[in-house]
């Protein structure tokens, strides 16, 4: 729904979209034509309406394209390194990284207690055991997410209330990956009243003051 809201913004086309690079935080390991792919949903909600440069839309590889999941993640990491440039294996400093939050506090396809949460390298990793179907996915690592200048969280509904509360309280990121995502310049939370229902008054006041 957040992408639909962006698509409906009256000043949407004021931006020079030809200069914008589009990346994915994660992707489901399904065929390119699958309705379950995040990029298909993003196309339908927003991207198909924008005058984007096709060379700057960086889709994650799809299943059934002659590449296995491990190599698909490596391929996406290589694309990140290529766009960043230089000899170091660094990923771009994203201007804005938009993240949803699961009821369990997962972000992208980094799930509580799973091995990928511990990964300290910049790049992308394969996921074989997602608690949510499909089990196989590709995800940016947490250090890659934390290269973003601005991290924007979007959470709505009562099932997100506990995750929002614990993330803002700073629960250990291994147990709640959302608490480990921080922009280098800013981190913002966009939540509805239901998702904010468990916030203490002092925490709510702190974030409203800094909004």
Located regions from the model:
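Short, conserved loop/helix-junction motifs that constitute active-site signature segments
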Residues: 12-21, 50-52, 116-117, 143-148, ...
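A glycine-rich beta-strand to alpha-helix segment
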Residues: 1-2, 80-111
């Amino acid at each position: 729904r957040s992408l639909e809201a962006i698509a409906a913004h009256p000043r949407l086309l004021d931006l020079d979209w030809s200069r914008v690079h589009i990346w994915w935080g994660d992707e489901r390991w399904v065929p390119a034509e699958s309705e379950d792919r995040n990029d298909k949903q993003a196309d339908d909600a927003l991207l198909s309406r924008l005058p984007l440069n096709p060379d700057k839309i960086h889709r994650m590889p799809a299943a059934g394209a002659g590449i296995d999941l491990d190599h698909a993640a490596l391929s996406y990491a290589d694309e990140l390194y290529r766009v960043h440039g230089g000899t170091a294996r660094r990923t771009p400093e994203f201007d804005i990284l938009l993240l949803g939050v699961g009821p369990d506090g997962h972000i992208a396809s980094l799930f509580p207690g799973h091995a990928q949460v511990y990964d300290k390298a910049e790049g992308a990793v394969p996921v074989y055991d997602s608690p949510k179907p499909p089990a196989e996915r590709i995800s940016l690592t947490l250090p890659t997410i934390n290269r973003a200048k601005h991290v924007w969280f979007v959470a709505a509904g009562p099932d997100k209330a506990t995750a929002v509360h614990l993330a803002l309280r700073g629960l250990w990121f291994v147990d709640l990956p959302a608490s480990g995502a921080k922009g280098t310049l800013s981190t913002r939370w966009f939540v509805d009243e239901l998702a904010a229902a468990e916030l203490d008054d002092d925490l709510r006041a702190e974030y409203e003051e800094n909004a």
